[in-house]
Amino acid sequence: MAAEEPAMAGEEAVATEGGGLLLEIVGSPLNLSLLGLCLFLLYQILRGERPAAQPGEAGPPPLPKMKRRDFTLEQLRPYDGVRDPRILMAVNGKVFDVTRASKFYGPDGPYGIFAGRDASRGLATFCLDKEALRDDYDDLSDLNATQQETLRDWESQFTFKYHHVGKLLKDGEEPTVYSDEEEKDAQDAKKE
């Protein structure tokens, strides 16, 4: 009988140890609060920053893909997300439709200053001030080699992410007339 008593005491210790962590968490209000906070943060990370959709409410329909064309600076300006819902910006002589990233390039976005403008100088020099914007065509000839390389990197990123809708015209330059076949070829090249 004496041999049975230590064995039973050992079983009780194992039973207490098995639920020990759970009892430790539930037994302390501080631990319970920290567990709740960790679970909430994990939920937020996994869920992402998607805004909650209201029942019966849909966001604005996506704009149709813009046909390829060239722009002067004046023709580009209305596409700032305010005067026109579409947002265009030029990078290194190419015009891109960045509407789907309006969170960044829209009126309230961190890069909103570039909407409807030639963003080349600002992106090349990492300047988000109005001084980086020119009212006339900017040939960017005064950029140093590092800034030119930075600009090419930005151009490459934009080419990969956004729809290239045309080129930025110099003063007096004639626009290119794009055919539907060229548009289709450009879309096919982007898919590859």
Curated annotation (Swiss-Prot):
It is found in: Microsome membrane; Smooth endoplasmic reticulum membrane; Mitochondrion outer membrane; Secreted. The keyword Zinc does not apply. Residues 172-192 are annotated as: Disordered. Disulfide bonds: none annotated. One of its GO terms (molecular function) is metal ion binding. Heme binds at residue 111. Residues 2-24 are lumenal. It is a single-pass membrane protein. One of its GO terms (cellular component) is membrane. The cytochrome b5 heme-binding domain lacks the conserved iron-binding His residues at positions 105 and 129. The lineage of its organism: Eukaryota, Metazoa, Chordata, Craniata, Vertebrata. Component of a progesterone-binding protein complex. Binds progesterone. Has many reported cellular functions (heme homeostasis, interaction with CYPs). Required for the maintenance of uterine histoarchitecture and normal female reproductive lifespan. Intracellular heme chaperone. Regulates heme synthesis via interactions with FECH and acts as a heme donor for at least some hemoproteins. Forms a ternary complex with TMEM97 receptor and low density lipid receptor/LDLR, which increases LDLR-mediated LDL lipoprotein internalization. This is Membrane-associated progesterone receptor component 1.
